[in-house]
């Protein structure tokens, strides 16, 4: 099978892009978690927090994390699918090609979605 993306420069470019998008994914999830933890700290430390504003921040964080993370994952999947036979036969190549991307996306939706829904619901319904 001939692959037009098999030169050494293409391999270096793929590795660089994968590193960059992996770092972007890491920082997106980290910022989302930090934002949610800070929001929880604000809610617990201030008695009269504006419920609607807090919910808006949580929803904006959810949207940012999901859109950015899904884009990073799609890029990583595309980078993996561009590997030539030699790269894809390595352990790392096989791991990238067999990664359960939909499972990762589902976990993000469940975890950040659950945080957003539960904190917003609790904060909006408390007296």
Residue ranges and their predicted role:
Residues 122-127:
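Conserved small/polar residues in nucleotide/adenosyl-binding loops
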Residues 67-83:
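Membrane-water interface of transmembrane alpha-helices
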Residues 2-65:
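Membrane-associated alpha-helix detector
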Residues 14, 18, 82-101:
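Short membrane-interface loop/juxtamembrane segments of multi-pass integral membrane proteins
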Residues 36, 61-68, 112-119:
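Helical transmembrane-bundle signal
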Residues 100-121:
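Final/C-terminal transmembrane alpha-helix of multipass membrane proteins
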